[in-house]
C-alpha cells in the first residue's frame, strides 16, 4: 500500500502552487526538461496509449513561429517565459500500441473507430499535460497553462505533414511572484462533488 505524501508535498503540488503570468530571467536547462519527462511518462493513460507529444520551445526563433497563434492576452507572458511547451496529441498513437500494450490487439480498437481514436488521444494527452504541470511543480518550476491560441496555426507552423495536433500550451519557468493576481476562489466539495 502506498504511503501518503507529506502535507508539504501537497502544498507544493497543489494548494500553494500558482498559475504564473510573469517570469524571472532564469533559464530552464535542456537537462531539466529531460528530467520533467522522466516521471510523467509513468502517469496512467487508457491502455497505456501515451498519445501526448511535447515540443519545448526555448529559442527566440521558436517563439517567433508561435507568436502569430497567440491571443493578445497570452502574448507577453508567453514571449517572456523561458520555455513554452506545446502539448500535442498523435492522431496515430495506436501505431505504438503493439509495444505499449501488448496484451491483445489494442491497435484495432482505434483503427476501426476514428472517433474513438480522436477522443482517446485528446482526453489522454490532456491528462498527460496535467502530469507535466505537477512534475514542473515537483521540480521547483512554475507553469502557466493556456488554451487561448489558434490551434490550426500552431499545427501548420510546427506539425505540418505529421500526425500531430496541438492541444494546449504551457509556459514553464521560475515565476515572478510580484506579478501574481490575488488568489482566486475554488468550488467547495459540496459544489463540485457528489456522494452516492
Curated annotation (Swiss-Prot):
HAMAP family listed in its UniProt record: Oxidoreductase_RutE_HadB (MF_01204)
Reactions this protein catalyses: 3-hydroxypropanoate + NADP(+) = 3-oxopropanoate + NADPH + H(+)
NCBIfam families noted in UniProt: PRK05365.1
Cofactor(s), names only, from the UniProt record: FMN
Keyword NADP included in the entry's annotation: yes
Protein name as it appears in the record: Probable malonic semialdehyde reductase RutE
GO BP annotation list: nitrogen utilization; uracil catabolic process
InterPro entries with a match to the protein in the record: Nitroreductase (IPR029479), Nitroreductase-like (IPR000415), Nitroreductase_HadB/RutE (IPR050461), RutE-like (IPR023936)
One MF annotation (Gene Ontology) recorded for this entry: 3-hydroxypropionate dehydrogenase (NADP+) activity
Gene3D superfamilies: NADH Oxidase (3.40.109.10)
EC number: 1.1.1.298
Keyword NAD included in the entry's annotation: yes
Function: May reduce toxic product malonic semialdehyde to 3-hydroxypropionic acid, which is excreted.
Induction: Up-regulated by the nitrogen regulatory protein C (NtrC also called GlnG) and repressed by RutR.
Entry's family note: Belongs to the nitroreductase family. HadB/RutE subfamily.
Keyword annotations from UniProtKB, A to Z: Flavoprotein, FMN, NAD, NADP, Oxidoreductase
Enzyme class: oxidoreductase
